[in-house]
From Swiss-Prot:
GTP binds at residues 17-24, 81-85, 135-138. It comes from Rickettsia felis (strain ATCC VR-1525 / URRWXCal2). It is found in: Cytoplasm. This is Elongation factor G. Catalyzes the GTP-dependent ribosomal translocation step during translation elongation. During this step, the ribosome changes from the pre-translocational (PRE) to the post-translocational (POST) state as the newly formed A-site-bound peptidyl-tRNA and P-site-bound deacylated tRNA move to the P and E sites, respectively. Catalyzes the coordinated movement of the two tRNA molecules, the mRNA and conformational changes in the ribosome.
Length: 699
């Protein structure tokens, strides 16, 4: 990390795209030409350097963002490889959070595909400046100009064409650089390492002039002095054009569009030049939002090497050689191995051991890293994704990443007792790596339940459990967590007596059960509870020491409701009277009496079955609105709102979780894969009686 590691020399970029647009191949070529990779890895042979997990090599899709450092000209480029499959959008969100700029790769044949829209919208959310690389220009049916139109129409973005392709499909051999007004042609025999500049071919002169004029019209708008010069017929210099393209890219006034064929090794070096010339350095971003721990005040912190140390942990990975690795993006200050920092989210100290610069699957030890760097730390104890590491004296919490709630759950059981312990360890490791994956235990069945972002997501988790941790497990079908409640108040007076020889048992309880929403004087601390117990015993009708027995009995018994055995929620139990016996009463006797009172009382409270209702948000192009709303209505959904966002529509609806299984596939087919959805738990609501009858029958 020599002195070229100045902030303006760093580019932290992501390469994001739809699955199969050629993103991994593009990254591979970048590594090859920047001298980090000695052999070109081909994805379709399962050998790419970036795709280093076994499943990725088999499926040919990128799952884990591996962070790689390489150099071009005198700049350091940190590349975060992002997955392109919809079930891994969490990985994309996570990497976009720590990037300064991105290259969106499009398939020259397919154009803007559905996942490209999703990733583009996520990049909008984090205000990531980006440029577009239209790839696969050598393929049959590739059409650069159609692709540019799709960027405009489908993404609602403003493309700035800075290159044109020379030759089409098989005869694609280079590009026209509209800034220099030169053609750049590659020599096939040198694996794309050698290329030369020449004059623009005569048959492309007119097109080049037309697009050059469009380019100038767009960029001069950013600078009044240059605009005047341009309008008065003076020549705008190459330097001025580059400076304006950079300014417009960083402010998202437009998105430069380049083209090439990564697989055929054409167009990669100009893409690297453009990354260096047009994408922002950490200095251009300038600030990071956060909170000062001492004051609790939200403020903007400068990105600078001279400020106190702060970094965001954005990825945790299990490395077969080093163990657990925490990838961090350093926003300010510097860090040395051996120093101690604080995790401000958990308020725990962390000692920095090994610090690694990662190159896909190779690693290089470093002793010091500073603002702008992306490094991996080995052996952190308490840090998880989204945590902030900070200087001990000036503590900050950087803006936390928001992770969507998982939308699908499955029960898993280990196949043998030997697998039991291994499975617990495997699942907790995987959950630490991936915040969109959750593990819990079902109180009713004792089963382990795993939750994730989609079927492919959970499939891959189960696959990793088998491969990396050697755990064999049986997988159940997706389930819904129903609940029960009462809808009217009732009062029960119950006496528990057992006096046949030896020590007897005696307890009398009088309990009022009522729905929580009907309780008038509910205390503030009880407002978010699903069960409230209160004792109004006066004059010692039930001695103080027996009252916890009543509460414990009710708490245990409410886990199995009276309709279909689901937990009872949203009710209050008030102990108003009772009686005891000097010899035969005990805590246990009152516990038994409370349970019996519950069983007797609940059927009188007009019990109802409840189901989880999800808040579903669907983002769709206009033309599919009708079908999507019709489908949501058929799922017992209630439409809450419809709003335009960019050139898409956002439909918000409340839909029962039970009706949402398999929705991702329905939505894909209704919208040709162009709509996307997210859902989070909203509330519990009563199940319609005809549906409740079916659920009871299944129990």
């Amino acid at each position: 990390m020599s002195k070229i590691n100045k902030l303006e020399h760093i580019r932290n970029i992501g390469i994001c795209a739809h699955i199969d647009a050629g993103k991994t191949t593009t990254t591979e070529r970048i590594l090859y030409y920047t001298g980090k990779s000695h052999k070109i890895g081909e994805v379709h042979e399962g050998g790419a350097t970036m795709d280093w997990m076994e499943q990725e090599q088999e499926r040919g899709i990128t799952i884990t963002s591996a962070a790689t450092t390489c150099r071009w000209q005198d700049k350091i480029i940190n590349i975060i490889d992002t997955p392109g499959h919809v079930d891994f959008t969490i990985e994309v969100e996570r990497s976009l959070r720590v990037l300064d700029g991105a290259v969106a790769v499009f398939d020259g044949v397919a154009g803007v595909e559905p996942q490209s829209e999703t990733v583009w919208r996520q990049a909008d959310k984090y205000n990531v400046p980006r440029m577009c690389f239209v790839n696969k220009m050598d393929r049959m049916g590739a059409d650069f100009y159609r692709c540019v139109e799709m960027i405009k129409d489908r993404l609602g973005a403003k493309p700035l064409v800075i290159q044109l392709p020379v030759g089409i499909e098989e005869s694609f051999k280079g590009i026209i650089d509209l800034v220099k007004m030169k053609a750049v042609i590659w020599k096939d025999e040198s694996l794309g390492a050698e290329y030369f500049e020449e004059d623009i071919p005569a048959d492309m002169k007119d097109k080049a002039e037309e697009y050059r004029a469009k380019l100038l019209d767009m960029v001069v708008e950013l600078d009044d002095a240059i605009m005047e010069k341009y309008l008065s017929g003076e020549e705008v210099t190459e330097e001025e054009i580059k400076r304006l393209i950079r300014r417009g890219t960083i402010s998202a006034a437009f998105y430069p569009v380049l083209c090439g064929s990564a697989f055929k090794n054409k167009g990669v070096q100009p893409l690297l030049d453009a990354v260096v010339d047009f994408l922002p350095s950490p200095i251009d971003i300038g600030i990071v939002k956060g909170m000062e721990v001492s004051t609790g005040e939200e403020k903007d912190f400068p990105i600078s090497i001279t400020e106190p140390f702060s970094a965001l942990a954005f990825k945790i990975m299990n490395d077969p050689f080093v163990g657990s690795l925490t990838f961090i993006r350093i926003y300010s200050g510097k860090i040395t191995s051996g120093s101690t920092v604080i995790n401000t989210v958990k308020n725990k100290r962390e000692k920095i051991g090994r610090m690694l610069l990662m190159h896909a699957n190779n690693r290089e030890d470093v002793k010091e890293a500073s603002a702008g760097d992306i490094v991996a730390l080995a052996g952190l104890k308490d840090t998880t994704t989204g945590d902030t590491l900070s200087d001990m004296d000036k503590q900050v919490i950087l803006e936390r990443m928001e992770f969507p709630e998982p939308v699908i759950e499955l029960a898993v059981e280990p196949k043998s007792t030997a697998d039991q312990e291994k499975m617990g360890l495997a699942l907790s490791r995987l959950a630490a790596e991936d915040p969109s994956f959750r593990v819990s235990t079902d109180h009713e069945t004792g089963q382990t339940v795993i939750k994730g972002m989609g079927e492919l997501h959970l499939e891959i988790i189960i696959d990793r459990m088998r491969r990396e941790f050697k755990v064999e497990a049986n997988i159940g079908a997706p389930q819904v967590a129903y609940r029960e409640t009462i809808t009217k108040a009732c009062e029960i007076d119950y006496t528990h007596k057992k006096q046949s020889g030896g020590a007897g048992q005696f307890a009398r309880v009088k309990i009022i059960f009522e729905p929580l929403k009907e309780v008038k004087d509910l205390k503030d601390e009880d407002k978010n509870k699903t069960f409230v117990f209160e004792s109004k015993i006066v004059g010692g009708a039930v001695p103080k020491e027996y009252i916890p027995g009543v509460e414990k009995g009710l708490n245990n018994i409410r886990e199995t409701g009276v309709i279909a055995g689901y937990p009872m929620i949203d009710f209050k139990a008030t102990l108003v009277d009772g009686a005891f016996h000097d010899v035969d009463s005990s805590v246990l006797a009152f516990e038994i009496a409370a349970k019996a009172a519950f069983r007797e009382g609940m059927p009188k409270g007009n019990p109802k079955l409840l189901e989880p209702i999800m808040k579903v948000e669907v983002i769709t192009p206009d033309e599919y609105m009708g079908d999507i709303i019709g489908d949501l209505n058929s799922r017992r959904g209630q439409i809450q709102s419809m709003d335009p966002r960019g050139n898409a529509q956002v439909v918000t609806a409340n839909v029962p979780l039970a009706e949402m299984f398999g929705y991702v596939n329905t939505l894909r087919s209704l919208s040709q894969g162009r709509a996307q959805f997210s859902m989070i738990f909203s509330h519990y609501d009563q199940v319609p009686s005809q549906v409740a009858d079916i659920i009871k029958a299944k129990k």
